[in-house]
Amino acid sequence: MKKRSIIVLTLLAGCFTNSFAQKGEKTLTVEVSNEWTQNKTDEPIVIDLNNLKAGFNIKSATVWEGNKEIPSQLDDLNGDARADELAFLIDMPAKSNKSFRIILSSEKSEKNYPARTYAQMKAYGHNNKFANITGFSAAGTENVYSFVYHHGPAIESELVAYRIYFNEKQTVDPYSKVNKRLEIKETCFYPTKAQRANGYGDDALRVYNSGGVGALKGWNGTEATHIKPVVNRTERVLASGPVRAIVEAEVIGWEYQGNDLNMINRYTIYGGHRDMKVDVLFDRPL
């Protein structure tokens, strides 16, 4: 398990302007402190936008350190076409403080930042063709493991890629890289012989019935158990952009130790990171 750093973040001030009924802008000043004795590179900063009460639908944002703009990303995490979080990456020297200015707007922006992460989910279609999809749901009794290309969503930074199996295993399978770059859009997790000869990475582990590099499992008192039976399974892509990529695996009605559980495993990878953050969310206390 990667030891996470402690970053202290404070929202100092906000200035709200609303020129028209459909137009709004809000400026925030954010103070960040690195209290560790080591430098931090590509440290994620995440702002919960729902707590800001902006008063308008946030459609774009810019983040500034002095006169330097920092790539940022707005993410809708619940599928309601509203941005829930703003994320950006910063470099922080040891025992240092920095101030950032964030401008939120109700106006759309055509601004594009260089991609540092990517998430992919594909489904097979007619004549062996496949389409990019953002999610897929099926009854727990259905075998859709081979319906989805590379058996579930794939997620990557420049340093590593993973895929999450779309079945009762929900195994996390790694794809190792030789060069620092995004590759999954080109290789789809299965590089050709020519691509491997040109320095592309490859599926690095035969996971069988294991947890791969790490996966949540049940426990029957003597051994780990897969996530079954369930009423319904869904896997989806939530974000893919310059700062982070997010995918989810959701099960409804998991029969486990006398309970019916609804669970979401949310996987987040940031640019410049090999580690992947996994949040396990239940709809009620266990």
Region roles according to the model:
Residues 1-27:
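Bacterial Sec-dependent N-terminal signal peptides
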Residues 99-103, 248, 277-281:
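Residues within well-ordered beta-strands of beta-sheet-rich folds
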Residues 133-140, 250-258, 277-279:
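Gly/Pro-rich turn-and-neighbor structural signature
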Residues 22-24, 76-83, 147-149, 236-244, ...:
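Short, ordered beta-strand-loop transition motifs
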Residues 101, 106-228:
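Solvent-exposed N-terminal domain segments of exported/luminal and surface proteins
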Residues 195-272:
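Extended, loop-rich substrate-binding clefts of extracytoplasmic carbohydrate-active enzymes
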Residues 263, 274-286:
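Acidic (Asp/Glu-rich), glycine- and aromatic
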Residues 22-128, 138, 142, 150:
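Alpha-mannosidase-like glycoside hydrolase catalytic domains involved in N-glycan trimming
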